Amino acid sequence: MSFMPYVAPEQMMKDRSEYAHKGIARGRSVIGLEYADGLLFIAENPSASLHKISEIYDRIAFAGVGKYSEFEDLRIAGIRLADLRGFSYGREDVKARDLANAYSQALSTIFTQQMKPYEVEILVGEVDGDASGTAIYHILFDGSVTDEHGFVAVGGHEEDLTGSLRDRFQSGWDLATAVQTAAEVLGSPDGRTIEAGSIEAGVLDRTRTQRRKFRRLEEPEIAQLLEG
């Protein structure tokens, strides 16, 4: 009969955290940024089909970094949960806070009970009425969740990007300024200029008359915004 060697719980959690951090750090970053008319999610992503940024529901968007298959599973689960809640109660009852809590619980369970944690960090954003109704929730691989204000960066070079955003961010930017600044910040750790074709971006635009506030920015529009 063989026995598994004893590992202290603290060491086990530390090892899982380090494993997840390494996986996430290998991925390209995502920035979430409030601007005058809503919320911008932007990332360096040359793929035209494997999206990091997506719509979840009418006023709610999702962004993920790390292992694509894992944050894609979370995105799909979030859409299903939002659809179910909207159908059962009402579309106005679907809130980003509730989705963030559901993601937090799921990731916490995976982190503590499964052998391998998810190598992901995700953002859930929401717009409502005016600027005071904008929300950004940052959920970590272990289920920790924080309510961010103004801006947030996740993925590789997270600390450098956050520091740069902290130095430069100003509330009330128009979309062009927000896109230009975010693109410059994304390329700053390596001193690179990121071209429009390598940028993925989407906005939650509260000024849209449609019920669905999410809009994906296509390459020609991104190029125009970068030119100012």
Predicted segment positions?
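Long, low-complexity N-terminal extensions
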Residues: M1-G228
